[in-house]
Amino acid sequence: MATYLIGDVHGCYDELIALLHKVEFTPGKDTLWLTGDLVARGPGSLDVLRYVKSLGDSVRLVLGNHDLHLLAVFAGISRNKPKDRLTPLLEAPDADELLNWLRRQPLLQIDEEKKLVMAHAGITPQWDLQTAKECARDVEAVLSSDSYPFFLDAMYGDMPNNWSPELRGLGRLRFITNAFTRMRFCFPNGQLDMYSKESPEEAPAPLKPWFAIPGPVAEEYSIAFGHWASLEGKGTPEGIYALDTGCCWGGSLTCLRWEDKQYFVQPSNRHKDLGEGEAVAS
């Protein structure tokens, strides 16, 4: 029985299956953890959702910002952008079933025995684990309710960007969503910066990666996250695992086997399509 953690799939179905074959993943015996952003940019978002849903109790995933955006597109709130390559999924006969399943997935996964926490973007240093649990439940409850389109319509935006237990209503839900699915940099006090997307070496002062600011969760738990492809899986402190290595941009899909901390990598098929000198986005 092994636990495999895989970074952002982004519709790269062929690479996902190849990677799972490489590690000899066995549903029913092994468990697969996915850092979110299952969909968008890659060519196989429909196949990814169908496969992951079919795994049942053998998979533990968290929602990412692209997964939430897909739900907003399906609800008619946001525009379907051609670059996201979501049309086959949106027009599939089982789209309703898949997306109703997707919106009932969590923002946070915790394994107390392994002392392991997973969220798409990470855990803000302003939260302890109990607060993170409560905040995740707040958004999950709305997403799984009949009023979820109202939330999806209001989730876009960068404010508020500083946590307070006094936050209420849509502002509270928006902060929680941004912290779990969009966060990269913070100010020294933990306040979110929602604008900078570069590598940590290029970030303007006084911004720091969220994981470089001491927080109560990281003191007791390992944290696995995705979202930040330009990290290339590097530069995090011990116990912090950055797993998004930019498969949909021509990088790779990365898997961490938890029991022995061994990494496995599947190169992106997209590098074959990138022209010479073409930039690889992050």
UniProtKB/Swiss-Prot annotation:
Pfam families: Metallophos. It catalyses: P(1),P(4)-bis(5'-adenosyl) tetraphosphate + H2O = 2 ADP + 2 H(+). Its EC number is 3.6.1.41. Gene3D superfamilies: 3.60.21.10. It is an enzyme of class 3 (hydrolase). InterPro entries: ApaH, Calcineurin-like_PHP_ApaH, Metallo-depent_PP-like. The keyword Hydrolase applies. The keyword Nucleus does not apply. One of its GO terms (molecular function) is bis(5'-nucleosyl)-tetraphosphatase (symmetrical) activity. Keywords: Hydrolase. Monomer. Belongs to the Ap4A hydrolase family. Hydrolyzes diadenosine 5',5'''-P1,P4-tetraphosphate to yield ADP. This is Bis(5'-nucleosyl)-tetraphosphatase, symmetrical. It comes from Escherichia coli O157:H7.
